[in-house]
Amino acid sequence: MLCRFAAGILAATISHTMAIETPDYKVAEQDGKFEVRDYPAMTVARTEMGDGDFMRLFRYISGGNEAEQKIAMTAPVLVQHKGEESGMSFVVPREVAAAKVPAPKGAEVSVDTMPAARFAVFTYSGRRTDKNEADALGRLRAWMDTKKLRAEGEPVFAYYDPPWTLPFMRRNEVMLRVAAEQQIVLP
């Protein structure tokens, strides 16, 4: 009985993850769980972190926008900490971004463009905790030092899985933008 339940959770998690659009990128270098990736410009819906942050974005993609248009959920959910301010973003699906992105109904959600850039990335599993984020960021910074890559800006944490995914099966990433003088973004 327990095995069937676990198998069901596993199957649901895998099928859910496989059906979600993720951003395009090109891998410039791979070293185990570390990569250097070139991302094209992306359109994101963003809100400030705080009570109800996820739900503000979820309402926006569920038709709570000026066009009352439903927008497919994508992965990952991006979290960026900037000193006292933190933000959460959803990447807008390519098809919607290529057409016309609906305007948010209020000031709580903004639609922004993340410019094309090269990022150093470390992939890890586990729960979303301050300790796990700090450990992952420390590992990425140490790896970047060995590669003589300099970071600029604040880290971006990427969470690909729904909260009911077993921690050891979660795909999480920490990303640091590679310094401008080291940017060689592929076409």
Where are these regions (language model features)?
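A solvent-exposed interaction/effector surface
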Residues: L2-P187
